[in-house]
Amino acid sequence: ENRHHRENLEDIVRTRTLALQQALEWLERTEKELRLSREETIQRLAIAAEFRDSATAQHVQRMSHYCELLARKAGLSPERCDLIRTASPMHDIGKIGTPDHVLLKPGKFTDEEFGVIAQHAEIGYRILSGSDAELLKVAAVIAYTHHERFDGTGYPRGLKGETIPIEGRIAA
């Protein structure tokens, strides 16, 4: 009777183990699909934001790739590098708030026009900030600081050196 009971228990364990393995495989596939969907959505929204400015998908992909490489070179964790890679395509999302007559103007901007175009960093920050999601927090920082310069001549705040968040220094 003990033998029979043990065999029944072993059958139950095998069945449940198989069910758990299948559930785990399903979760892994679903998680991968969600991650890919999130990244593709971000890429497509970034392309849409830059569409009026003749930006291409290749620009967004290059930006993402170079930011990841620079983050790695800076010694950031693999998780942080991936976060920066995923968030960086949103750097110019604020351009959706820039009027066409300025954004699409050929040639050099007047001081006034430059002031208008420079607002895209703050607009992007306002669009992306306020989320609890780490990805959007990083994207907001990148949007706000990707035109800052190490010597303090950048915009919108004229930050200098180490006061520029690492994500912004990488994206610049």
Residue ranges, per PLM feature:
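Histidine- and acidic-residue-rich, metal-dependent catalytic cores
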Residues: 29-172
